[in-house]
């Protein structure tokens, strides 16, 4: 039996980030055996002519395309989508983020906006990361063509159940908690707010309080953020409260996730969708501190999975909520079971497989109908 051919048009690692990790998980899974996968890497915009040529000569049954959320990237995407439509190719796009609608409504020209509406309307389907993000494509494509595929924590970053139980048990009598920020150092991601939380902790301890939190940071710096980070830590003498790990992966990342108790991502990043780092933290039985931004509320509920900060909360109020938390072990184990049952790698792959199968079956049925009509 011939396998259906799926062409994946996306950014592949390196570097490793949320999007590239998601498609890498697909390529290195059973889907690579079930389908004949073809890869077209779009991370080098200078190679756009080469990308177009590869698409033109591809005989894939389905094109799976992860779209951009920048003005320039959108122009490239429109060119690719126009080519696929001209060639009457079956196309499914996957939005790994939550900014696309704001991009085309606010950031691009009227002509580019109109082109986007026309391009989306002509697609066979779109995928978003969570239920609340379906609104991004409302009015652009019929609702039944909007699919939800939630992100996952890869198996290598999920604790075995027995280890998760033991970790939660140790939280009962633990006096000092390790708080982890694991993301890129972008201002809108909220790392500066985490530094201010570390400063509040230092001031409280200096006023005869017992140390309750140590803050661990890991990720890649962008622009001048490394200078800001180092200057802040040095100016406020936070070396006893802050540890910088740099970029981590593999065993180092596993170790950091295992050793930390609370995960913090106070993000307001415009392009945010459903952060994989939050899912990985849940898979390591961690208490979550985050915001009601993008698709995060579909995953984290305030009081149930941790603290979900609204836009009007002050840093002092957030710190007070951290101090007031009790029974962390129950919340952390609940987060672990949620990740295993809902955000596992197997669930993610099954969801992708299901959407692909739906669209490919439609194509097969259409071909059969056409052949029968010719008889």
PLM segments and residue spans:
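Conserved donor-binding/catalytic core segment of Leloir-type glycosyltransferases
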Residues: 6-8, 165-200, 216
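Acidic donor-binding loop of glycosyltransferase active sites
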Residues: 258-272, 286
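Conserved acidic donor-binding segment of nucleotide-sugar-dependent glycosyltransferases
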Residues: 302-313, 321-326
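A charged, aromatic-enriched C-terminal amphipathic alpha-helix characteristic of glycosyltransferases
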Residues: 313, 326-357
């Amino acid at each position: 039996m011939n396998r259906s051919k799926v062409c994946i048009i996306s950014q592949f690692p390196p570097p490793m980030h949320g999007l590239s990790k998601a498609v890498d998980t697909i390529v290195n899974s059973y889907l690579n055996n079930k389908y004949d996968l073809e890869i077209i890497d779009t991370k080098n915009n200078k190679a756009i002519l080469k990308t177009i040529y590869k698409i033109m000569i591809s005989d894939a049954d389905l094109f799976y395309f992860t779209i951009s959320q920048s003005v320039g990237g959108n122009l490239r995407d429109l060119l690719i989508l126009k080519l696929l439509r001209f060639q009457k190719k079956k196309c499914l796009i996957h939005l790994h983020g939550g900014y696309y609608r704001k991009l085309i409504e606010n950031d691009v020209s009227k002509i580019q906006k109109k082109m986007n509406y026309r391009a989306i309307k002509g697609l066979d389907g779109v995928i978003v990361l969570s239920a609340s993000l379906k609104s991004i494509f409302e009015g652009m494509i019929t609702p039944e063509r909007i699919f939800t595929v939630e992100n996952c924590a890869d198996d290598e970053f999920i604790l075995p159940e027995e280890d998760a139980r033991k970790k939660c048990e140790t939280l009962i009598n633990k006096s000092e908690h390790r708080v982890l920020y694991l993301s890129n150092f972008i201002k809108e991601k909220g790392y500066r707010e985490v530094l201010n939380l570390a400063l509040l902790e230092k001031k409280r301890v200096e006023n005869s309080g017992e140390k309750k939190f140590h803050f661990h940071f890991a990720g890649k710096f962008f622009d001048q953020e490394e200078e800001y980070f180092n200057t802040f830590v040095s100016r406020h003498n936070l070396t006893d409260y802050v540890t910088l790990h740099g970029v981590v992966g593999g065993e180092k990342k596993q170790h950091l996730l295992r050793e930390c108790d609370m995960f913090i991502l106070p993000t307001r990043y415009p392009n945010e969708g459903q952060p994989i780092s939050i899912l990985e933290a849940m898979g390591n039985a961690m208490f979550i501190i985050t915001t009601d931004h993008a698709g995060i509320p579909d995953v984290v509920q305030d009081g149930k999975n941790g603290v979900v900060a609204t836009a009007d909360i002050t840093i002092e109020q957030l710190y007070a909520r951290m101090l007031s938390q009790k029974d962390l072990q129950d919340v952390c184990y609940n987060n672990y079971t949620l990740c295993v049952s809902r955000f596992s790698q197997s669930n993610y792959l099954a969801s992708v497989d299901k959407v692909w199968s739906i669209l490919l079956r439609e194509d097969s049925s259409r071909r059969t109908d056409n052949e029968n009509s010719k008889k």
